[in-house]
């Protein structure tokens, strides 16, 4: 066992003394059992994580029952909804790297034999996922689960995205204060990750097809007894993985990454999943995984399930309709869409895991014969603004919009754009360009949920587009193109767009272009000032120095002269 490094031999007597002092060693025989880390992310200010201490206790009990010795530690977490619209959002994506580094540090410093990861919200799941393939210790994931959808006084289903869009409607005068306050009070009625197919739930669903979590992980409610049963079940599976020495890199292969994007396309997941899954591929040592490959997957996978913010359906509706397993089963039966014979943490293949799954409500999950669209709900765009690619959630765009051509109105920050939208400087026919908000430029690639929600809240969801080297919340909908690469701070051509330039977003052809000759763009480049970091000290300064653009997954890159 790995843990023998800290508990066997005369030299480890001091370590054994310290282990006895933890209170986790209940009998002499415990030193001969596998040591299992519980990587938790309990935090009081994140509603998706307030109940995770209780779930960790369930995991501890089950791990002991299955023959292991549990040791819990905690990571940090950022709530994107609370951190939205101010400097806190600049810490959100960077927190992914802190979480990965922290988990790596504890796991490798203490030579654990297995790891039970309990994430839930936006950057916590991918951060832990990066740690799992980096340390490559037998591991399993079981998230905290989604919250229930809210309900307004008028009987309308609510999610957090309802509140963000209500801000724009209230400012516009099209919503009463009474209705506005009703939404605020009732949109998030329980603990758990936000109720729509936003980033947290998208990632937790992808864990099922990656093979790192048991069926039900993505949709079983946080407040249900079934969530506790998933934790127990996962603990026993983890002990089998430890016994058989099945490791994350045995499960997370190039085929698994392909299948994650296939499910993402079928359920119209958050665009942030593209960032995180590309980063995962890099961390797992999977080479040459790029945005063009994702487009190829999108072309062969139908769009089967529209969930909030693209519809009124919540994650609980998906669960009742058959869950992620029902969507995966449709892809298995489609043939050629995924690789169903890959091994998973259950010891079974994907095909075996979903063999008995079925669709219980064809309004929530469409059968493969009747998809929302024959192609996936996410699309990668390329063109002279985004030579390395950009991302759009086509499932969140009104179907009547196939090509959008408009006049650029440019901003160098999120805040400038929000002010212009709110004071009606932005009008019908505009393409709002927000640059210098990428991983390096932001820094931290903040989400542009406030401007997109204001656009939709003003009733301009089909009439105004927004493009950015920043990113979007999973709650974003509308004509919103993000992750433009290279970013402006890295000299990307989005920095060369001027007010009044005509920009064309062509969804069928997956292109994003500005109608300006190449030679004019090159002349503009000569006048472009050198980018200077916005933050000079602390973690964000270090992050700025090392981070890369979105087409890599926004990973940190060590200078080559330090590793050659």
UniProtKB/Swiss-Prot annotation:
Mg(2+) binds at residues 80, 122-123, 447. Coiled coil: none annotated. The active site is at residue 473. [2Fe-2S] cluster binds at residues 121, 194. Its EC number is 4.2.1.9. Gene3D superfamilies: IlvD/EDD C-terminal domain-like (3.50.30.80). GO terms for cellular component: cytosol. It catalyses: (2R)-2,3-dihydroxy-3-methylbutanoate = 3-methyl-2-oxobutanoate + H2O; (2R,3R)-2,3-dihydroxy-3-methylpentanoate = (S)-3-methyl-2-oxopentanoate + H2O. Keywords: 2Fe-2S, Amino-acid biosynthesis, Branched-chain amino acid biosynthesis, Iron, Iron-sulfur, Lyase, Magnesium, Metal-binding. Its cofactor is [2Fe-2S] cluster; Mg(2+). It holds the Pfam family ILV_EDD_C. The keyword Cell inner membrane does not apply. Homodimer. Functions in the biosynthesis of branched-chain amino acids. Catalyzes the dehydration of (2R,3R)-2,3-dihydroxy-3-methylpentanoate (2,3-dihydroxy-3-methylvalerate) into 2-oxo-3-methylpentanoate (2-oxo-3-methylvalerate) and of (2R)-2,3-dihydroxy-3-methylbutanoate (2,3-dihydroxyisovalerate) into 2-oxo-3-methylbutanoate (2-oxoisovalerate), the penultimate precursor to L-isoleucine and L-valine, respectively. This is Dihydroxy-acid dehydratase. The gene is ilvD.
